Amino acid sequence: MSSQPPRVRSRRSERNQTAERPLEDDIDTSRRGMGPGVRPVVAVTGAASGIGHRVALLLSENEQVKRLIAIDERRGDIPGAQWRIMDVRDPALAGRLDGVDVVLHLDLDLSLDSEPRARGARNVRGTQTVLTAAAAAGVPRVVLCTSAMVYGALPENETPLDEDAPLKATADASLVGDLLEIEELAARAPRAHRALNVTVVRPATLVGGPEADSVLTRHFEAPRLLVVSGSRPRWQFCHVDDLASALVYAALGKVEGVVTVASEGWLEQEEVEELSGMRRMELPASLALGTAERLHRLGLTPAPAGDLAYTMHGWVVPSTRLRDAGWRPLWTNELAFAALLEDVAGRHALVARRLGRKDATTLGAAGATVALIGTAAIVRKVRKRRGI
């Protein structure tokens, strides 16, 4: 790694010590007729683990929260929380939200290892149930969390994107399809339930914990960094700690509508290579995309070819509404990327498929280029076995 931090092509964080918390008097209470200083009752789904647990812990320590309702299928360790042990897809959820002012729905299955159809059905059904239950219980506000990936990664993307830019992602790109359906539900809910306000938080590439495992973090588990010829990647990260603090802002009504969250600025591909010490492997688009598509179609990798676009083109977001509300990220892109490298150390993946130790040793010796091109042999072998 370079001893000097690389130049970032955007403004740095203006403050990197602590994220500001919204003042109680600043909380928007107009939608539920509450006067200034009235503390909300907050419910968090998925509170037993992952980002839901991180957010619930922050809310349990926040004096601006009157009461915390933790919802999950099992109990977690959150001081002072009142637990509701249930599946968020259960229609009985409406009866467990009495007196709640805001619901943070964070109970999503984002695992690359889950069966795609079952995962999608769970995520969409869970979100539908939460929105319907909140409206039925008279909850004024719901906060959802998707991803900035819903904007799509296109060569014509502006840098940074406008928070209100249209969603151009393709629905077949792994988890993005689930997130696009959730976005559609978020857009429809206030029209169907006029008293319901829905906030959607869209983080950049998550790093900083097991809940951040994704196609994009596994990109850095490969023996070399795949670069598609002619592309210009721009890397932007969001540490889970920054996402958690942003979700607290949303819970307290400090931000509404569409909210993006990320470290300030971005890193160019050359900076990522310098910081990581990894060498690039540059391949023509036809070879890289064709190989990824064949491997996915045969069930050998969890990532369809469409996901490679997120490593080819920029999809940088500005965190405008959060910044206007006084929020600042604690993590720069350089620090967040360092956390990512620490998390993936010792892991090995190729086209988002996790490899065993023996496979990784072979790849390290043969080189990633040979491995990728050699997937043609894997394809032929699988086809022969299946009689294709």
Indicate where each model-derived feature is located.
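Conserved C-terminal active-site "lid" loop/helix of NAD(P)H-dependent oxidoreductases
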Residues: 240, 270-271, 299-328
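Active-site Tyr-X1-5-Lys
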Residues: 171-199
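Mid/C-terminal beta-alpha module of Rossmann-like enzyme folds, strongest
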Residues: 246-305, 347-355, 380-387
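N-terminal Rossmann NAD(P)H-binding glycine-rich loop of SDR-like oxidoreductase domains
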Residues: 39-61
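Amphipathic terminal alpha-helices
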Residues: 333-388
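NAD(P)H-binding glycine-rich loop region in Rossmannoid oxidoreductase-like domains
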Residues: 85-128, 133, 137, 153
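Conserved Rossmann-fold NAD(P)-dependent oxidoreductase catalytic core, especially the SDR/UDP-sugar
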Residues: 129-174
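Alpha-helical substrate-binding/gating segment
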Residues: 217-226, 232-267
